[in-house]
Amino acid sequence: PTLAATPVARAVKLLPEAPRGIFVVGCRFSHTASDDPIVHPGMTGMSHLHQFFGNTSTNANSTTESLLGASTTCGEKNDKSAYWVPALMVNGQPVAPIRASVYYRGAKNKSVRALPNGFKLVTPRGDATTFWTCKVGGVATKRSTGAGDVPTCTGDEQLSAHVRFQSCWNGATDSSDHTSHVV
């Protein structure tokens, strides 16, 4: 998963005993494409299939400027960020996603600020940072042990992917590997 452009903060009230800065971005599914403007910029169709959320214009040629000028599927209409993940496939066909919920959490007793325009990040190790759950009414009923261990959801259960990104940022908007500026 990757992201670009600038998220806009929305305050979330937390319990008094656990103060920390946080904001949440909720975005509906936008589109599917074999593009990745961070890993393969300007190279249309060079990536594996991705499912995009948030910015509706995201493609291999996306720039900060093009993202800022486009519309969004996010609940916060000023959030022009682009979020994408590899497409989940069943029998060679992509599974239609519903939404992406992105949480930005600060350290305890610290504030959270919006990331700057042009911020880019790719998660470095999919298996080390990804797990799956089956959920009913937002409550996990099953949980995987890693990215390759996808549980079988039944009945009213919905499959949910969870991707954890690095959390200590050095202030740069990008790095040559798109990961080392956040550890």
Regions found by a protein language model. Name each.
Residues P1-S47, Q51-V163, N170-V183:
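Primary mode marks residue(s) on the alpha4-beta5-alpha5 output face of response regulator receiver
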